[in-house]
């Protein structure tokens, strides 16, 4: 009787293996592969105090994180917040509706409209701090990267809290070494186990991503959109097609779930299996696409785009295309190409200032920090000056900074300057936006007088006068710009245009950061001036070691459709540039997803079908 009381009956569903996707000749395009995953099951008694439960879970997850990373693997990264290039928290989603859907999920709200204005306006950092408080994590004692990993795991567990005995994946596709280390330490890792999961794989993914899409865990919004009959077949832990063929044919590819009923003891160990129903595999899908033709067409299109870029590339740092009467004579200044390495994050500017930075990185960073201090000082001086020059009298560079502050930062990014409140026919608005006869200082002070400024986004301070509000705006701007990676990119753009940061330095960093395999002769030549940066870049584009999709210079995208004239079958449907859907499937790489969403070359946009292939948009 005593043993019986310590046993708990549990039922767990077992997903069916997803069907494969083949081309017209039976060549595999998407398949499944068994791999080890680190999982955790919440077996902490429900009557445990929240503080004690948080400590147990956090200690366990900290140990898991150490084991996983010591063996060269990584924990899940599918949370809606990532670290930007300056190491600050930012939302992975750039689409406002998707961002608010994530914020609503964090706050346990079924609908976006249920959020308060304060909740809607929370920054990514505030969301992280809110969750840290909920999870008992002290964010002041750890760096942002560690906190984000812990929040990733705790949040994933929280999504399964509606069913206590549901396991949560903490790390997928881990090595044998990680699996062995977890098993060796299992006695001290409460609820942690190694499972063998079926992971989705896409060989040659970049060529087919725009067609195939990818899989991932179903979202609350996707689940809510299902019919009542469909909800009987799906649960919130299911892996589903998120876009492309994977999404359209999800009901075909999905297998039928199996079910296992068993008893566990108070330590969560299985003591007896009561019943078991085997899962059934999903159906395979065959496409009219010819895999080899698809790959060949993709490569042909990439070569063609590279050829056009090279034909337009000019060995000048700055260039005004408006002077050309015929667009066919417009050139691509090499300065734009050098800038693309930073603007499109081919190289990582946050590494420039690290203690282990290489020579070219250090030199560029020193130039940048001096420039940033000068520009911030000049900007704040103009914003504080009632008699500052009118916008039209500023230099092209200073205009770019003012545009960024007003249009990008205050309007689009933060919403401090409320676009929906601005009166387009207002005389002062016209003077700023069209005639360019006033300064940003005068414009913002006028915006305050017209109640176009949302002071709730400046912090918790109360403002009793227009002067205090303007001071609050300036203080906010000064602090924000210090950590704003997009503003940093704009600074680098003008450093490169002026030659203060050289093309040779940028090209050398490509080797220093491992974007291309180290070539000592070329690298040293770039540093000492014996290798011409323009010639180096020309060669790398010509040989496609640096691609049009990476540089995102115009043209950088295109599409090819090949059909069989007899049957009408689509044999190839190429959209360039593609993306690696393996990094989005299973457990999404949120940082990579954000790079794709913000990339100037728009890899999610299907250039054949003319729509955005990502499910989030």
Language-model regions: role of each:
Residues 278-282, 602-610:
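Flexible glycine/proline-enriched surface loops and loop-helix/loop-strand junctions
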Residues 1-541, 545-559, 578:
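Membrane-proximal periplasmic segments of bacterial cell-envelope enzymes
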């Amino acid at each position: 009787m005593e043993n019986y009381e310590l046993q708990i009956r549990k039922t767990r569903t077992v997903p069916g293996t997803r069907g494969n996707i083949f081309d017209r000749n039976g060549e595999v395009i998407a398949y499944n592969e068994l791999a080890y995953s680190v999982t955790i099951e919440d077996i902490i008694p429900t009557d445990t105090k929240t503080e004690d439960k948080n400590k147990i879970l956090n200690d366990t997850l900290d140990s898991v994180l150490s084991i996983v990373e010591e063996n060269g693997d990584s924990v899940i990264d599918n949370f809606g917040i990532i670290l930007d290039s300056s190491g600050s928290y930012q939302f992975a989603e750039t689409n406002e509706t998707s961002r608010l859907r994530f914020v609503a999920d964090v706050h346990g709200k079924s609908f976006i409209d249920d959020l308060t204005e304060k909740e809607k306006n929370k920054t990514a950092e505030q969301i992280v701090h809110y969750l840290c408080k909920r999870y008992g994590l002290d964010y002041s004692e750890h760096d942002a990267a560690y906190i984000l990993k812990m929040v990733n795991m705790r949040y994933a567990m929280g999504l399964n809290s509606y069913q206590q005995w549901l396991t949560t994946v903490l790390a997928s596709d881990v090595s044998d070494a990680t699996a062995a280390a977890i098993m060796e330490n299992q006695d001290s890792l409460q609820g942690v186990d190694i499972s063998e999961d079926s992971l989705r794989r896409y060989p040659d993914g970049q060529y087919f991503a725009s067609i195939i899409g990818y899989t991932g865990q179903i979202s609350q919004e996707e689940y809510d959109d299902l019919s009542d009959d469909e909800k009987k077949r799906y649960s919130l832990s299911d892996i589903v097609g998120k876009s492309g063929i994977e999404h359209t044919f999800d009901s075909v590819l999905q297998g039928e779930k199996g079910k296992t009923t068993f008893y566990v003891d108070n330590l969560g160990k299985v003591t007896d299996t009561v019943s078991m129903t085997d899962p059934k595999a999903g159906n395979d899908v065959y496409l009219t696409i010819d895999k080899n033709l698809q790959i060949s067409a993709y490569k042909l299109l990439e070569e063609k785009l590279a050829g056009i870029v090279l034909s337009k590339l000019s060995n000048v740092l700055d260039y005004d295309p408006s002077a050309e009467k015929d667009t066919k004579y417009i050139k691509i200044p090499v300065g734009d190409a050098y800038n693309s390495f930073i603007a499109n994050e081919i190289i990582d500017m946050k590494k420039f200032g690290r203690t282990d930075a290489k020579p070219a990185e250090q030199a560029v960073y020193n130039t940048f920090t001096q420039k940033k201090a000068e520009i911030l000082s000049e900007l704040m001086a103009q914003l504080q000056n009632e008699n500052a020059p009118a916008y039209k009298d500023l230099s092209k560079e200073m205009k770019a900074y003012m545009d960024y502050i007003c249009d990008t930062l205050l309007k689009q990014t933060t919403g401090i300057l409320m676009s929906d409140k601005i009166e387009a026919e207002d005389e002062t608005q016209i003077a700023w936006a069209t005639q360019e006869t006033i300064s940003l200082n005068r414009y913002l002070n006028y915006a305050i007088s017209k109640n176009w400024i949302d002071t709730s986004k400046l912090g918790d301070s109360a403002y009793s006068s227009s002067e205090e509000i303007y001071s609050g705006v300036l203080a906010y701007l000064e602090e924000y710009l210090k950590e704003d990676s997009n503003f940093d990119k704009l600074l680098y753009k003008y450093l490169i245009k002026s030659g203060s940061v050289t093309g040779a330095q940028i090209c050398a960093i490509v080797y220093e950061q491992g974007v291309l395999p180290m070539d000592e002769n070329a690298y040293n030549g770039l540093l000492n001036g014996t290798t011409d940066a323009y010639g180096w870049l020309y060669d790398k584009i010509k040989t496609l070691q640096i691609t049009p999709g990476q540089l995102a210079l115009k043209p950088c995208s295109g599409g090819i459709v090949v059909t069989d004239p007899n049957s009408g079958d689509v044999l190839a449907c190429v959209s360039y540039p593609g993306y690696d859907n393996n990094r989005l499937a299973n457990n999404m790489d949120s940082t990579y997803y954000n790079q794709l969403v913000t990339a100037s070359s728009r890899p999610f946009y299907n250039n054949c079908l003319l729509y955005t292939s990502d499910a989030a948009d």
